[in-house]
Amino acid sequence: MELAQIVERLKKNEVVAYPTEAVFGLGCNPNSKSAVEKLLILKQRPVEKGLILVAHKLDLLLPFIDESRLKQSHWQLLTQQYDCPTTWVVPAKLSVPKFITGQFDSVAVRLCTHPAVAQLCEQTGFALTSTSANLSGLPPCKTAQQVRSQFGEFFPVLDMAVGNAVNPSEIRDIFSRQIFRRG
């Protein structure tokens, strides 16, 4: 599908697939409970796990982050470029719904450098949820065709290539720097 069609689907609170730095992600409007519920059902993902949010600029992630708990050094970590894509677990605002945070009082966020994410966020005006595009037990999709094979020929997928990263993003705690998933 073309970019404009994917943007329309996102604005209608539908779930789409889009390329990221290493694999295709399944995404939707994180402000829509119905969209996130569709995503969780499709992915067969428990709500307790929480979701990653991605955007091309920090402004779109700020509504989810409890800024009062972060120091300048944390902001530097969050905005710095890394050799591999890095998702940071940060304190969530109290207003962030549990369908985003899961069982946690934190939220996982990533500044994504992939042009598809930048274009989608720019045109929708919101961050995207990001969970790897794959059915339970299958490897994450690295091409639009793999997405169609797993989710059906008519699943809305942005037909662009993934980035050059080898693995999905590393996930780290902003305070302790603990690695939850290696990149």
Swiss-Prot record:
Main EC class the enzyme belongs to: transferase
UniProt keyword annotations, A-Z: ATP-binding, Cytoplasm, Nucleotide-binding, Nucleotidyltransferase, Transferase, tRNA processing
A GO cellular-component term linked to this record: cytoplasm
Gene Ontology terms, MF aspect: ATP binding; double-stranded RNA binding; L-threonylcarbamoyladenylate synthase; tRNA binding
E.C. number: 2.7.7.87
Family matches, as InterPro entries: DHBP_synth_RibB-like_a/b_dom (IPR017945), Sua5-like_dom (IPR006070), TC-AMP_synthase (IPR023535), TC-AMP_synthase_SUA5 (IPR050156)
Domain YrdC-like: 1-183
Protein location: Cytoplasm
Highest taxon of source: Bacteria
GO BP field: regulation of translational fidelity; tRNA threonylcarbamoyladenosine modification
Biological role stated in the UniProt entry: Required for the formation of a threonylcarbamoyl group on adenosine at position 37 (t(6)A37) in tRNAs that read codons beginning with adenine. Catalyzes the conversion of L-threonine, HCO(3)(-)/CO(2) and ATP to give threonylcarbamoyl-AMP (TC-AMP) as the acyladenylate intermediate, with the release of diphosphate.
Protein family: Belongs to the SUA5 family. TsaC subfamily.
PANTHER family with a match to the protein in the record: SUA5, THREONYLCARBAMOYL-AMP SYNTHASE
Full protein name: Threonylcarbamoyl-AMP synthase
